[in-house]
């Protein structure tokens, strides 16, 4: 039996959702999505879906406390969570979200080092979720530098200046 079947930290999720992590704008401002879910809710869903519900009450309380600590911040208790998941899953578990929308569940699962996949009928949601939960977390250090040096910047300076003047002139006329 999974933890989510017996217990979910509703009060902690509600409290952390009011405060948010960091600026609160990073993930949610990338694109507008009609069902904006807090990151803490996704993290709680991932953790409680993967962790077992033990028979021993002391062990239940220990795991509940671990989940509560993990919900206090973006990277809170991640090392302890990784150790706990390694006890229960010899291979890295896969997390699949069949209606991922903005991709918050795959994002939080990926931040925990899990194999995460998000699926959605909407091509826009699929692209956005991939950009947020897949491409952003990849190691791009081996990619070649972009072929724009200072000369490339100079080519665009005049065009940018011209475009800004055009917009400001239009704003001034209105």
Where are the regions a protein language model picked out?
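S-adenosyl-L-methionine-dependent nucleic acid methyltransferase catalytic domains
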Residues: 1-174
């Amino acid at each position: 039996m999974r933890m989510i079947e017996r217990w979910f930290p509703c009060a902690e999720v509600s409290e952390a959702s009011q405060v948010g992590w960091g600026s609160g704008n990073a993930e949610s401002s990338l694109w507008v999505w009609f069902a904006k879910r807090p990151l803490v809710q996704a993290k709680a869903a991932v953790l409680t879906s993967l962790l077992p519900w033990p028979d021993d009450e002391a062990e239940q309380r220990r795991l509940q406390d671990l989940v509560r600590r993990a919900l206090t911040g973006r990277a809170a208790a991640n090392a302890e969570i990784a150790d706990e998941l390694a006890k229960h899953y010899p291979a890295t578990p896969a997390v699949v979200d069949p209606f991922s929308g903005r991709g918050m569940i795959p994002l939080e699962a990926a931040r925990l080092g899990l194999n995460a996949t998000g699926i959605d009928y909407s091509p826009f949601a699929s692209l956005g979720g991939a950009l947020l939960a897949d491409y952003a977390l990849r190691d791009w250090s081996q990619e070649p530098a972009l072929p724009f040096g200072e000369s490339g910047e100079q080519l665009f300076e005049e065009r940018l200046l011209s475009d800004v003047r055009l917009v400001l002139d239009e704003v001034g006329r209105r």
